[in-house]
Amino acid sequence: MARRVLAWEGARCARVELTMLDGAAMRRLNARAFGRRRLTDVIAFALPQPDGSLLGDVYICPAVARRLVTNGGRVREELIRLTVHGTLHVLGYDHPDGPGRTRSVMWRRQERYVRRLLGGKR
C-alpha cells in the first residue's frame, strides 16, 4: 500500500517501513518522540538521506484502528487509511488539528488514495 502511494505521489527514491505496535509500545513511542503520554493511531518519521532519497518509518496501532471504526466500517479499511496517512506525512504533508483536519488538502488526498486501494469502493 505504501509503495503505491509513493508511486502515485511520484516519489521515485523513497522507501517506507511499516511497523504495527501494541498499545503499550505506541504509548511509549509517542512519549519518547513527542512528549505525549497517550495512545495514538499513527506516528510517522521522515528521514531524508544525503543522496536525496527518502526513508520513512510509519508506526500503526491496530488496537486504536479497531476503536476508530464506526458506522459499519471495517478494521482493514482503517488500517489502509492509517498507512496512507502515515505515508503522506513521510512525504511532507500535514493537516491542522481539530475540525479543519478533514477539510485539509492532505485529508482529501488520503481519502482519494484509500478509495483507490479499496478498488473504488466508497
Language-model segments: which ranges?
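Active-site rim/adjacent substrate-binding subdomains
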Residues: 1-78, 90-122
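Catalytic glutamate of the conserved HExxH
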Residues: 82, 86-90
